[in-house]
Amino acid sequence: MRRLPPVLLEDGCPRELISLIRTILAACKEISFRVGQGELSGVLGSTLDENIQGETQKKLDVLTNQLLKDILLESGYVKAIASEEEDYTVAGNPDAEYIVAFDPLDGSSNTDINSLVGTIFSVMKAPEGADPADQSIFMQPGINQVAAGYVLYGPSTILALTTGKGTRFFTLDKTHGTFLLTQDFAKIPADTNEYAINASNQRHWQPAMQNYINDLVAGDTGPRARNFNMRWIAAMVGDVHRVLSRGGLFTYPTDTKNPSQPNKLRLLYEANPMAMLVEQAGGIASTGTERIMDIQPNAIHQRVAVILGSKNEVETCLGYHK
């Protein structure tokens, strides 16, 4: 099995970008260990604090954010970072070429029940000569990403990574601390009979999504004339990994549950990197009205609707939104 650096070198990745990705993964190896220790590590449960999103922070949210923040800023490879757990961007090396946005522990509410969690990250180039303290350097559409990925902490620790040359899976060899290539060029099947959505919010969805899901639930007695299965892990990283592995549709649509916050997922460090991974594997990633990676951001923690996965099924879903 091949190690990560030679694979990226063959793709023509700049050495500094490879070094940056390896820096991110160094933090993720430590996170994998802490998550794997569970109750033994003393970091399960919640803190008394909330993050900028108004969400109660888990102890592991704080720990994983600090690990990634420290190792990235100390590396010298980043001009600035943006994190789900930071109110504002954090300046790094003024001479660095790259900026990184990340969700340090997606699905952190799952830690207390020993279920799937993961780290999501997005890498872009900073505008030349930009001030590292200027948050506007992150206001770039997802098509500007030079790398995107996640590390899934499950029975094994898996890295899904793209640098624009396809989506690959690497598995952490915990004996040697090395990520090894275990699937070259993931390909999402165009058709599927699986979908992932938080069905408890159905009464709050827009009519288009309600109609689409109702037709899936109707199965072979409805207009789709075949049966579908629903899956829901309650961690985007887990649900998207299933889509990349065997196909499916994942969505967190716009809803009216909280009128001041109609969308759930963050554009910069959740929707954009997942969209790049999915598109590089032959899938589609949309808000329901536009391609996710075409969106011009207007805030660090901007939220968007997400519909992504198998090409033909996503296109069918989008047809309900026209």
Swiss-Prot record:
Binding of Mg(2+) 1, residues: 84, 103, 105
SUPFAM superfamilies in the record: Carbohydrate phosphatase
First-level EC class: hydrolase
Entry keyword annotation includes Cytoplasm: yes
Species in which this protein is naturally found: Pseudoalteromonas translucida (strain TAC 125)
MF-aspect GO terms: fructose 1,6-bisphosphate 1-phosphatase activity; magnesium ion binding
InterPro entries registered for this protein in UniProt: FBPase_C_dom, FBPase_class-1, FBPase_N, FBPtase
Protein residues bound to substrate: 106-109, 198, 264
Family membership noted in the UniProt record: Belongs to the FBPase class 1 family.
Cellular component GO terms, alphabetical: cytosol
Protein name in UniProt: Fructose-1,6-bisphosphatase class 1 1
Record-listed E.C. numbers: 3.1.3.11
Enzymatic reactions: beta-D-fructose 1,6-bisphosphate + H2O = beta-D-fructose 6-phosphate + phosphate
Gene name as annotated: fbp1
Subunit relationships: Homotetramer.
GO biological process: fructose 1,6-bisphosphate metabolic process; fructose 6-phosphate metabolic process; fructose metabolic process; gluconeogenesis; sucrose biosynthetic process
Cofactor: record remark: Binds 2 magnesium ions per subunit.
Binding site for Mg(2+) 2: 103, 106, 270
Subcellular compartments: Cytoplasm
Pfam families (alphabetical): FBPase, FBPase_C
PANTHER family xrefs: FRUCTOSE-1,6-BISPHOSPHATASE-RELATED, SEDOHEPTULOSE-1,7-BISPHOSPHATASE, CHLOROPLASTIC
Pathway: Carbohydrate biosynthesis; gluconeogenesis
Cofactor list: Mg(2+)
Keywords tagged on the record: Carbohydrate metabolism, Cytoplasm, Hydrolase, Magnesium, Metal-binding
